[in-house]
Every structure is written in structure tokens, then in C-alpha cells.
Amino acid sequence: MPTPVDAFHNFHPVTRAWFERTLGTPTLPQQDAWPAIQAGHHTLIAAPTGSGKTLAAFYVAIDRLLQAALEPGHYRTATTVLYVSPLKALGNDIQRNLDVPLAGITALLPEFGLPPVEIRVAVRTGDTPQQQRQHMLKHPPHILVTTPESLYLLLTSKGGRQLLSTISTVILDEIHAMLGDKRGSHLSLSLERLQKLTGARIQRIGLSATQKPIERVAQYLVGMDNQSKGKPDCVIVDSGHKRKLDVTLEVPQSPLTALMSSEVWGEIYQRLEQLTAQHRTTIIFV
């Protein structure tokens, strides 16, 4: 497994600086996935929630876009990264999550003596207003966030095909949720149509919860043309078993009864307040 220093080896100094200053050391999925993605391999990242899967998939693409933007005479306004999510809400979250590193990276450019650049992200779903759809066709985003259904519709229109014709990277999120049903089959067909449209190899990156057998998920990700003797031509980053859990069971000091008194609830609320203040993120199931 590469060390954190090795994980940043091929990154631009600006993208490396933002990550180290803001997030510190890359997570294990990021350390394992980045070299494979930078080498151009199809990559499946299987890791639990909160392990940095999003930047594990996206950060190489962001770095590529930045380096292309800074190279004189080679920067073009074209959509090269396609993110597909089975949920519209998840797609909107991804756009907001990408805005933070993109804004931070571009803000660092003057410090490194580099000119300003713009890397745009747009969402295209059934809820996208017609005015925004037309704007995307005239001013293509560098990263397009969409759903399987909207991808299919884009592939059926002249403007949509033109927008997608420059795609070089596809990121499939929650890929395990689309296996084994008609929606997954439909998306698989759309990916093959997209591959034929571009006329060039498209790098496929999948994000999944830990699944077994993980090889079946990888087969779905790469498609039929990217398999050898039944084995997917894909790097599998399976970090699900590497996450450590610290579990603590606590009970109130007052006796527990079938109908808990307000005193007991008061102790629970007080403890929840303490835990919330001590931690950056807290999830409470009631």
C-alpha cells in the first residue's frame, strides 16, 4: 500500500496543498485508489460511509482538470467527467461537496503564482429547469452530475450527445444499489452507448458499499468488453474490512422502567448534548 506521500506523487502542487492543509492525511481508500486511477485503470472503490470515497473517486479528475486548465493552449470548455447517481438528492449533495475543494483549490492559485481558472460543475436531472439545460449545451460544465434516467435521455438528443461526446471519465456512485434490476441493466446499456459515442476508451470508476462477491460488482462496472476469461479488467479497492469501530454502551444512572420518567430523559438529553459538543459529526437514531 502506498504511503500518504506516494499517494500525492503525481498531483499538482496546488491540489496537494489544498488537501493537506484542509483534510490532512488521505484515508486508506484514497491512498489505494488514486495511483490506480492516475494509471488509467478502471477502479472499483468499496468502502464504508465516511471513508472519503467521494474524493477518492473525484480528486484525480479534479487534478487533471486543473493541470489541463493551466497548460497553455490546451484548455477547452468541454465535459470530460460524468458522475451518475441513482438518487437525485445524492447528486445535489455531490455538487455541493465538490464546490468546497474546487473553491479552495482555485483560491490557492495566486499563492503559487498561477493564473485564475474555472472548473464548473452542473447537475442534469428531471428537475433541472429548461433554461439551465440550454445553458449547459452552450456552456458545457467540466463535471456533469446526472441520474441513469437523465443519462439515457441525453443520449437520445442531438445536443445531449454533443455534450457527452467528450467524456473521458465516468463515476458511478452507489453502484451496488443498481445491480440485479432493470434499472441497472438500463444503465449498463447507456454506458455502452456512451462508449460508442465517444469513440475512445472511457475510464470507469465505481463507488460501492462493501459487497460480496465484490468481483460481481466489478464485472458490472467495466462491462463485457473489459473482461478477460471472465475476470474484470479492474482494480478493486476493498477497504470495508479495514475500518475500526469504537463501540461504547451507556445507560442512565436512574433505573430504567417500561415508561421512563422525565428524570431519565433529562439525563439522556444531557449526555447527548455532551457527545454532540465533543464530536464533529453526530447521528442520533430515535
Region spans (language model):
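Conserved interdomain linker/interface between the two RecA-like ATPase lobes of SF2 helicase motors
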Residues: E192, Q203-V286
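Conserved pre-motif I regulatory segment
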Residues: P2-A46
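SF2 helicase catalytic motif II
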Residues: L144, P148-Y152, T156-A200
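Conserved helix-turn-beta segment of the N-terminal RecA-like "Helicase ATP-binding" lobe
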Residues: L90-V123, Y220-S228
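Motif I (Walker A/P-loop) of helicase-class P-loop NTPases
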Residues: T54-R64, S185-L191
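Conserved helicase motor
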Residues: R120-Q132, E149-S150, S239-G240, V286
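Conserved motor-coupling elements within RecA-like helicase/translocase cores
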Residues: P116-E118, D127-L144
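Conserved SF1/SF2 helicase motif Ia
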Residues: D63-I94, L109-P110, K196-R201
